[in-house]
């Protein structure tokens, strides 16, 4: 069901591999297939955002989890979760998995680390499997910190052993890059899939596309009204309501 993706070009992936040596199962071209407990793990020589062998992921599981570093302009110790997507296309989002990982990260985070749920951003874009990034930020010190990277393993162990029956599958449109509704996810008010950030050109076509790119049907959408101008805001609301999706306006 699950498959881990680790990239040798990524320092967090390398630290994770130091902590958790994984036996080699087979090699497919430049891709190694290893085993993390009972979960297949793909080890790739490049960067996480450059991974291109979705066919290998699809042969091993349905839900891919990328182990990765997090970078930001004003670095601070941070654990993050997000779905990848280089707009206007995106990966398949997994609201249940992403939200479970986020809650587990927050549970196991320790000072000075904080946790954040990020808007959908950067490659790769998937269509056959869901993709979820789980990250440690935001400098070399944190990327190589075995205790910090060990929190990712704790979150994986906790999240992947849970039954994924959860609250309302929800997406958000027009939020900030570091989403402002993460506390609601933490409290279990809903499970969050794609978050369309306010800084992209938001269109009805994008909304139509991301609705199709979730592992479960979206039942609710949170729209940040001040960040989406009319007439496009009204068009998006009408589109969602016509599909029977609950719309909540914020701001």
UniProtKB/Swiss-Prot annotation:
Enumerate the Gene Ontology biological process terms.
Answer: D-amino acid catabolic process
Q: Which InterPro entries does this UniProt record tie to the protein?
A: Deacylase_DtdA_archaea, DtdA
Q: Which cofactor does it need?
A: Zn(2+)
Q: Which Gene Ontology terms cover its molecular function? A: D-aminoacyl-tRNA deacylase activity; zinc ion binding
Keyword Hydrolase present in the record's keywords: the answer is yes
Q: Which UniProt keywords apply?
A: Hydrolase, Metal-binding, Zinc
Q: Cite the cofactor comment.
A: Binds 2 Zn(2+) ions per subunit.
Q: Does the keyword Hydrolase apply?
A: yes
EC assignment: 3.1.1.96
Q: What SUPFAM superfamilies would the database entry show?
A: AF0625-like
Domain of life assignment: Archaea
Q: What Pfam family is a match for this entry?
A: tRNA_deacylase
Q: Which Gene3D superfamilies match?
A: AF0625-like
Reactions it catalyzes:
a D-aminoacyl-tRNA + H2O = a tRNA + a D-alpha-amino acid + H(+); glycyl-tRNA(Ala) + H2O = tRNA(Ala) + glycine + H(+)
Question: Which HAMAP family does this one have?
Answer: Deacylase_DtdA
Function of the molecule: D-aminoacyl-tRNA deacylase with broad substrate specificity. By recycling D-aminoacyl-tRNA to D-amino acids and free tRNA molecules, this enzyme counteracts the toxicity associated with the formation of D-aminoacyl-tRNA entities in vivo.
* Record's subunit section: Monomer.
Similarity section: Belongs to the DtdA deacylase family.
Question: What is the designated name of this protein?
Answer: D-aminoacyl-tRNA deacylase
Specify the species.
Pyrobaculum aerophilum (strain ATCC 51768 / DSM 7523 / JCM 9630 / CIP 104966 / NBRC 100827 / IM2)
Q: What is the lineage of its organism?
A: Archaea, Thermoproteota, Thermoprotei, Thermoproteales, Thermoproteaceae
This protein's encoding gene: dtdA
